[in-house]
Amino acid sequence: PDVIIIEGQGALSHPTYLSSTAILRGSLPTAVILQHAPARTAISDFPMFAMPTPASEINLIETFADTKVIGLTINHENMTASEITAAITMYELELGIPATDALTRPTGRLLDMVFAAFPDLEVKPSIVAT
């Protein structure tokens, strides 16, 4: 296959979600799409740790895994539709990469991220889903 999608769990900055390190090292991704929850003020289950910024997480990922973050998805928990739209716009301007909410925006936006990062890929109509 031309593209393999590997779902991850947790962030490199999370104090207990070590599986993300194994996923990044083991899969050797050419590109990563990061997910961020803008309404969270602290890391899940650790209120003493402030939620990292997408910029800091991107820096960690790109340094640790020698890869490129090509997009950002928004975890919209505790956000209104207008807050989601504002967050997408803000992060696109701040980070210089495309952003979307995969659950409330057209899913084609995720494909757009991949095709923009890899222009030599051909659009193929077959999609395998599980």
PLM-predicted stretches and their roles:
Residues 3-106:
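Conserved catalytic-core segment of NTP-binding enzymes
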Residues 52-56, 121-126:
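Short N-terminal or domain-adjacent regulatory/targeting segments
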Residues 102-105, 112, 123, 127:
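Charge-biased, low-complexity intrinsically disordered regions
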Residues 114, 118:
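Hydrophobic "lid"/C-terminal helical patch
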